[in-house]
A protein has these predicted regions:
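A short Gly-Trp-Pro
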Residues: 1-12, 18-210
Length: 210
């Protein structure tokens, strides 16, 4: 059986102050997904940086085990926001507002790296060779307009990601994580929690009416 080739992929923000590596990555080591949920669109609106979402409001993310992620430069520039007290931890570069990753907690072993942070100098074709194409689209009910292609059934995508999550949990691949302290399990940076008013102003329906 041929050995699956893996590679270390550079990570970096637009201003170059925050960078690192995704270790031992292949098309089967994670799951590339496009998410159209209103929370991801709200986060993109909060960052106010072009190119985070596609024309339909989708965010291209790569779900991998946190232990594969190394932030080697500019870690002091890492910032975090939560859309609510129970929301995901959403990480970005404080300087240029490039989104880095979404995580749930120390105990849930996944990190959704933003495509804009993964090998930012690579072309889309080169990225697909390394990571594979998106395996599907989720939360398409929040998409802006009609998607050009019929999306994969969401259940199939969720089941695939669930299998990966179970594997990472069983193998302890959630630690070490650059986003949470190994000893205390606290987030690496104190998150800013948006107020209900701030969050409401960022919702897709609010932005479309402004």
């Amino acid at each position: 059986m041929a050995k699956l080739l893996t590679t270390d992929i550079p990570l970096g923000c637009a201003c170059g102050k925050l960078s690192g590596l995704a270790l031992g990555v292949s098309a089967s080591s994670g799951a590339r997904v496009v998410c159209y949920c209103d929370d991801c669109q709200s986060y993109a609106a909060f960052l106010a940086r072009p190119g985070i979402t596609d024309a339909w409001g989708g965010t291209d993310v790569v779900q991998i085990a946190p232990s594969r992620v190394r932030l080697t430069n500019g870690v002091q520039g890492l910032a975090c926001v939560r859309l609510s007290t129970k929301g995901m931890y959403r990480w970005h570069c404080a300087e240029c507002k490039t989104p880095v990753a979404n995580t749930l907690s120390y105990r849930v072993p996944f990190a959704s790296l933003f495509r804009t942070f993964v090998d930012p100098g690579a072309t889309d074709n080169a990225c697909e060779e390394l990571l594979g194409p998106p395996i599907g689209h989720v939360q398409t009910k929040f998409a802006r307009g009609t998607l050009p292609n019929e999306p994969e059934p969401m259940l199939r995508v969720v089941m695939h990601c669930g299998r990966l999550l179970g594997k990472w949990w069983l193998t302890g691949a959630g630690s070490p994580s650059p986003f949470f302290d190994t000893a205390t399990h606290a987030p690496a940076v104190e998150p800013r929690i948006l107020t209900p008013v701030e969050r409401a102003s960022l919702r897709p329906e609010a932005k479309s009416q402004s």
